[in-house]
């Protein structure tokens, strides 16, 4: 099993670019930069896309330009066009249930209230069995404050921790293709930015 599509979840537009909810897109942007494969808008996939080679494998990158709760439209369009199965997809997203400075790989599971994941599961035929990269953004402590929190911009001190976790996650994702998922997971899950 290899990953053929890496997706970074986000809301479109300048007003959302620096918000916590866009952490998944920050990850794919960094990966595209590291692999010198600039993302370009591609209307038929409802997002910015690029094609990279990782460990000799042909991999597509995608940042949907739909709103977060319609992310599945872009993912399903690309998966269908390139005949990519759910278990060949890695979706990077912001994760309230992980602390700042931490990122973790996970296969399958629920959506945990994340509207992007919810729509992807639905558009993949109610199939939750895709890989996720959960990027810790911390939790505001009160569930009534969650919407404002994820759509807010982290202060510089928090942004630094998120960026460091994303940087390590990019290295570990590349490692996944060369050394396997177990090794990459062990390294990523041992990391915590200080």
UniProtKB/Swiss-Prot annotation:
The keyword RNA-binding applies. It is found in: Cytoplasm. It catalyses: an N-acyl-L-alpha-aminoacyl-tRNA + H2O = an N-acyl-L-amino acid + a tRNA + H(+). It is an enzyme of class 3 (hydrolase). Its main location: cytoplasm. Keywords: Cytoplasm, Hydrolase, RNA-binding, tRNA-binding. GO terms for molecular function: peptidyl-tRNA hydrolase activity; tRNA binding. GO terms for cellular component: cytoplasm. One of its GO terms (biological process) is rescue of stalled ribosome. TRNA binds at residues 16, 67, 69, 115. Pfam families: Pept_tRNA_hydro. The record marks 11 as: Discriminates between blocked and unblocked aminoacyl-tRNA. Its EC number is 3.1.1.29. The record marks 94 as: Stabilizes the basic form of H active site to accept a proton. The active site is at 21 (proton acceptor). PANTHER family: PEPTIDYL-TRNA HYDROLASE. Monomer. NCBIfam families: pth (TIGR00447). Belongs to the PTH family. This is Peptidyl-tRNA hydrolase. It comes from Escherichia coli O17:K52:H18 (strain UMN026 / ExPEC).
